[in-house]
């Protein structure tokens, strides 16, 4: 799939949380809160002014209730507005 966001939007690939605790206990999908995950990798950018400083490959934290989900086979992506990106990790 070749998706290019337009305007001040960003295509993100959510980063799955570790489903094991530090002590090695495996968590069920219900207890790991995967539905509220809010970290992702930037896959593509639009051309908006608010995107300054964000690059493809950056790891970001975004508003967990934002964006539109898109699926490509088994891979899930999100398209979010630039203002929904809260921070760059690293």
From Swiss-Prot:
GO terms for cellular component: cytoplasm. It comes from the Bacteria. It is found in: Cytoplasm. The keyword Cytoplasm applies. InterPro entries: Chaperonin_GroES, Chaperonin_GroES_sf, Chaprnonin_Cpn10_CS, GroES-like_sf. Pfam families: Cpn10. PROSITE patterns: CHAPERONINS_CPN10. One of its GO terms (biological process) is chaperone cofactor-dependent protein refolding. Heptamer of 7 subunits arranged in a ring. Interacts with the chaperonin GroEL. This is Co-chaperonin GroES.
